[in-house]
Amino acid sequence: MTTKRLLSLLIFITSLSVSYAQGYINSTMMYDGLTREYSFYVPASYDGTTSFPLLFNFHGGNGVIADWQTTADMRPIADTANFILVYPQARQDPSDGNSLNWLPKTPGTFDDVPFISALIDTIASDYQIDQNRIYACGYSLGGEFSYELACKLNSKIAAIGAVARTMQADPNSYCSPVHPTGVLTILGTDDFISPYNGLTFGGIEYYISAEATHSYWATHNNCDTTATMNTVSPSVERYTWSTASGCAYVEELKVIGGG
């Protein structure tokens, strides 16, 4: 089972017995001289009297909002958990043939972290948002960008989820979280695009391993560095680093043979 299929299955299971949700609201905002697109969903339970959590869901590299909403439609979950759901659109990356990327390829220099910060402020100007419960999740490059937000927009991001991606190399050089930050990963052991054991090419490390990724966050989050494992299915193992006092959880769904 691929990690992308597992994500779809998890969303499907969570949404069982839930009536179909209402539609998305498509919108734009000007940022850094560009018209940026995003699509969001407000549950019917929102009436403006109670602050709602905010969840960002980021598509993968060269993805588009509409396709990702079809693959990862979280509206039924937003209805039951009562949060506002946002799907932003990545910008064109001139260093990568104008593909749609959250992070620029070398020698590109754009930075979308401030854009997400501005988008949070824009949405919060129109809706009552619980500023202590703003979350990010994403698939592949979207998962990598979720780590980026946990590292560089940590004052606004409470927790993240990353599917099919480990962290970039040497996180201590760029990651400066200011509070314990919950982290959930869904990683396939046979993923050749984002290898489970990290990626080193030509003697240069580009991505650290799943083990190193979880160790980084378990240490930062004051968790026990030894995980507890239980079997979810013959192909999925669940690891949790959450037993120490004051720990902000770290959790992995490890897909055996997943790519």
Where are these regions (language model features)?
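Active-site glycine-rich loops that stabilize anionic/oxyanionic intermediates
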Residues: 52, 59-64, 258
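A domain-start/cap signature at the N-terminus of enzymes
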Residues: 19-54, 67, 77-80, 84, ...
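Gly/Ser-rich "nucleophile elbow"/oxyanion-hole loop immediately N-terminal to the catalytic nucleophile
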Residues: 44-50, 98-141, 151-154
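Bacterial Sec-dependent N-terminal signal peptides
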Residues: 1-23
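Acidic catalytic loop of the alpha/beta-hydrolase fold
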Residues: 190-194, 259
